[in-house]
Amino acid sequence: MLRPEISSTSPSAPAVSPSSGETRSPQGPRYNFGLQETPQSRPSVQVVSASTCPGTSGAAGDRSSSSSSLPCPAPNSRPAQGSYFGNKRAYAENTVASNFTFGASSSSARDTNYPQTLKTPLSTGNPQRSGYKSWTPQVGYSASSSSAISAHSPSVIVAVVEGRGLARGEIGMASIDLKNPQIILSQFADNTTYAKVITKLKILSPLEIIMSNTACAVGNSTKLFTLITENFKNVNFTTIQRKYFNETKGLEYIEQLCIAEFSTVLMEVQSKYYCLAAVAALLKYVEFIQNSVYAPKSLKICFQGSEQTAMIDSSSAQNLELLINNQDYRNNHTLFGVLNYTKTPGGSRRLRSNILEPLVDIETINMRLDCVQELLQDEELFFGLQSVISRFLDTEQLLSVLVQIPKQDTVNAAESKITNLIYLKHTLELVDPLKIAMKNCNTPLLRAYYGSLEDKRFGIILEKIKTVINDDARYMKGCLNMRTQKCYAVRSNINEFLDIARRTYTEIVDDIAGMISQLGEKYSLPLRTSFSSARGFFIQMTTDCIALPSDQLPSEFIKISKVKNSYSFTSADLIKMNERCQESLREIYHMTYMIVCKLLSEIYEHIHCLYKLSDTVSMLDMLLSFAHACTLSDYVRPEFTDTLAIKQGWHPILEKISAEKPIANNTYVTEGSNFLIITGPNMSGKSTYLKQIALCQIMAQIGSYVPAEYSSFRIAKQIFTRISTDDDIETNSSTFMKEMKEIAYILHNANDKSLILIDELGRGTNTEEGIGICYAVCEYLLSLKAFTLFATHFLELCHIDALYPNVENMHFEVQHVKNTSRNKEAILYTYKLSKGLTEEKNYGLKAAEVSSLPPSIVLDAKEITTQITRQILQNQRSTPEMERQRAVYHLATRLVQTARNSQLDPDSLRIYLSNLKKKYKEDFPRTEQVPEKTEE
């Protein structure tokens, strides 16, 4: 918003009236994050581009006055006359508090690739003159009835700080979503790759990242800063002085702002100094960019440990197309697109965050699955909930606006508060219909959400609102409709002057309509009154059935625009009446705003129930979306054991974009056979299969049904993929170098609870080196209990099963079809996965045969390949002892698995064990019949 300039004075000095020169008494106290801040205690300013007054404090948290040497406007500058916003006695002091600047302009920051530095959060300089432009929008002060920001546009600000010295690697993070008044704190130890930090930031998808200036110093930046800037090229960076990362101040902010019901977070973070330091800097910065403060005891603050959810790194999220399609970079053909049938922005955001951070707690997942199952079985519950949920607005953004207290009383701030109070009334009136829709639900989670709707505070807040706000004031589409709702929101007889102002406004609107009607009669034209938020009232006319004399409108009409056969224009008299209308509106908004602020101050003590309502609505919306997705396909409820078993599973995204249902395949991975080597020709389905496994795993861990006839999953705490093999020109990385970086990341971070999917590792270098690298990587991963699926063209790797009994070989089948027209064989892809090594040898050469390569070249390639293969494979046969140990190993793992997971009755279990014993006896003699000497 525009801030009229004033003369620069010391904040601690008494204000002087520009017109009279008389000394005014200082303004009363202002809120500052729940604290009362007097003009004498306003923070000091240090501006790089202007000389700073002596005496500026260098200690964190010091509050002393200073003045800027930047040019100032004339002493008699003042706001426009007639406005109820901006010409109050406190105007000068408020402007001094809000007109602060950064130490470097945004343009210079862009040129040097270093972020601009915020020397102190507040400044008396003029932001117009300092050249600083804020990238973060002011949320909620839009007069429009629609959201200021779309549901998925970035709106998160993150502060990141790292320990120094022996504490290097200890990371503190604090983030706030401008559309959701919730602060999330994190503190964790990271390694030198900073994988956890990068992954966490990718999930948050920040609009802006704040760091300490000592971490980003030109020529001496930390490794963390370098890695973040490399991975987030399109994110804005801002640095502030290290002293504002103050853990003591951070703890004070939490004590002052956190709602009592969430105050247990204080116990969790008391000794977590780095996340406290991050939240101190974050809140100070948000106060600056939003030009507002949060009301005391109004924020939800929580601590999230890294162990509460599964980790999916950003490269894997891109490879699996969780949110963005790799072809057109949209969210249509993605896992999000498959599951997203949400009706509210909050539900959509919740689905997105769950896909990127799946749950790891089996009990919580099963509670969600119980809900989805009940929604599928009870159509009345499903459609009843869906009908009510679709009527909710963005409750999270609504809360975000309600809990902020603007530093300046502007027209936009007033209009926003009035609008959001109407939205709040609309939201609270949906609580009873939501309760009615849920009254017959049975599952524990749905019953818990139903219980949260029984909170008496919903009724208390709604009753307080209805004592002030008209019963028929409601949310309506269209800017003119919402303007009318805002004007007449407050009941009559509460403020006599407000009633008079509204009558005046009504008369002006009637006069405008009458004037346009008279103009239509005067010129015999079909004129009609129209309205837009930008132009106010104007005149429109269509020329379908009339002919204009000389193809011109009367000279009285000005600002004429034409779109097809429709004219839009105004007149000098209408412009004057619009000005009168706007002046009347400002009076109405001012008086309504005063009443609304008083009402909101009485609501803040009950605000916790609104957070519960927001959580309930977004969760119900997501669960309904899961149920909706199930009705469109034959998904099945997953089970959770220590085995990954999928019967006839298929790729969910491929199903959505294909005309025919994808080919289904089985998957079976256990602790005894936790390493699958998958071979097959190019385009046989290896990459699609790997992605399918990961997508099904994620769907199961967020509480969704999965595309299969039966499915059982082991909880994966990390999901890694190495699939993409494109060169990265921006970072000067070849295919091979990119492969090595990705596989190194996996090896550094994988553990026993990981799901690892690797596709064609080593193809970026020569065959010998590729095989050597793959073999070494396989041996390392085999030392873990992670579930690994390794797709490769190196058939030599298949013989590793002779050394490691937990290796299983699988392959994709192909069929050979005679091409009668060209008298050659063609490959028919079945996309079916089978056990054992592929019978296809040299399928690359077969693909070359059907290409345009000369036959002589293909023949030479075959001869050379045969010689190389004979040399490599001549000593890779297993001994009888290896085969015997392998058989014993598989029997033991089957017995352990049966003991852990069997749900068979005693008789069936006895039969199963008997059959298992027979199979072992049948297999065991064969191992003894293998000749001792296998050398040719």
From Swiss-Prot:
Highly expressed in testis. Also expressed in the ovary. It holds the Pfam family MutS_IV. Heterooligomer of MSH4 and MSH5. It comes from Homo sapiens (Human). One of its GO terms (cellular component) is synaptonemal complex. The lineage of its organism: Eukaryota, Metazoa, Chordata, Craniata, Vertebrata. Residues 35-55 have a biased composition (Polar residues). One of its GO terms (biological process) is reciprocal meiotic recombination. This is MutS protein homolog 4. PANTHER family: DNA MISMATCH REPAIR PROTEIN MUTS FAMILY MEMBER, MUTS PROTEIN HOMOLOG 4. Keywords: ATP-binding, Chromosome, Disease variant, DNA-binding, Meiosis, Nucleotide-binding, Premature ovarian failure. Residues 1-83, 103-133 are annotated as: Disordered. SUPFAM superfamilies: DNA repair protein MutS, domain III, P-loop containing nucleoside triphosphate hydrolases. The keyword Methyltransferase does not apply. ATP binds at G680, P681, N682, M683, S684, G685, K686, S687. It is found in: Chromosome. Involved in meiotic recombination. Required for reciprocal recombination and proper segregation of homologous chromosomes at meiosis. It is linked to Spermatogenic failure 2: An autosomal recessive disorder characterized by male infertility due to non-obstructive azoospermia. Testicular histopathology reveals no round spermatids or spermatozoa in the seminiferous tubules of SPGF2 patients, consistent with meiotic arrest. Belongs to the DNA mismatch repair MutS family.
